[in-house]
Amino acid sequence: MVLIRVLANLLIIQLSYAQKSSELVIGGDECNINEHRSLVVLFNSSGALCGGTLINQEYVLAAAHCDMPNMQILLGVHSASVLNDDEQARDPEEKYFCLSSNNDTKWDKDIMLIRLNRPVNNSVHIAPLSLPSSPPSVGSVCRIMGWGKTIPTQETHPDVPHCANIKLFHYSLCRAVYVGMPAQSRILCAGILQGGIGSCQGDSGGPLICNGQFQGIVSATSKPCAHSLMPALYIKVFDYTDWIKSIIAGNTTVTCPP
């Protein structure tokens, strides 16, 4: 418990001085304490900050660009200033990536699977979120959450995670506004067209939940965050389920989807 408190104090510092390269929820409200049991915090003492999603007792899914040296993982956190009795801390034992040197596929390879150094115990504030059983539908209302910035122009982060509802759009909309995106991709396009609500610095790696299913990983946003007509980009989890399941089953040399 002493270690948890030390790490929690570090997290408070990170939320105050988080790097500008992370992502945060703009235009959202404080999450209910019971709706983010799978949300984890990835951070280190140098100021890096990201979210992630617990998918079973031993594995966390996040964005590849959230990889950082000396990574610490906190689970069961609601308030950075008030310790939950069931908060748990873990270190990464192994990290798995889908790296690509192909410009047409590097956009959608921003995914990292982390094996924890020891299993997590389910509790009141900690529970995994299962992988999706089917892909999401365009038009779905989806939920985002994280400790990212709540004001795009300020480097302040909330004490508790913020949540917001956004809409899933056709991929072609994001391709039209983000230069260099390929014709086909394993990326989801989601946001609010009028702007003002969306992921931002500090939210990277966190979940996109559509109709109760874990469908996306926060990957990239407009600059500034939640800009009108510029939805954010999310890695499509469904397309990687076979890769993820193979690694969990012990096949760590499995090939990523093309």
Curated annotation (Swiss-Prot):
Query: Do you know which InterPro entries this protein is assigned to?
Result: Peptidase_S1_PA, Peptidase_S1_PA_chymotrypsin, Peptidase_S1A, Trypsin_dom, TRYPSIN_SER
Question: Which top-level group of life is the source organism from?
Answer: Eukaryota
What organism does the UniProt record list as the source? Answer: Trimeresurus stejnegeri
Major place of localization? Answer: secreted
Question: This protein is called what?
Answer: Snake venom serine protease CL2
Tissues of expression: Expressed by the venom gland.
Q: Name one GO molecular function term.
A: serine-type endopeptidase activity
Q: List glycan-bearing residues.
A: N44, N103, N121, N251
Its biological purpose is as follows:
Snake venom serine protease that may act in the hemostasis system of the prey.
- Tell me which stretches of the chain form a coiled coil: none
Task: Quote the PANTHER family the UniProt record gives.
Answer: KALLIKREIN-1, KALLIKREIN-RELATED
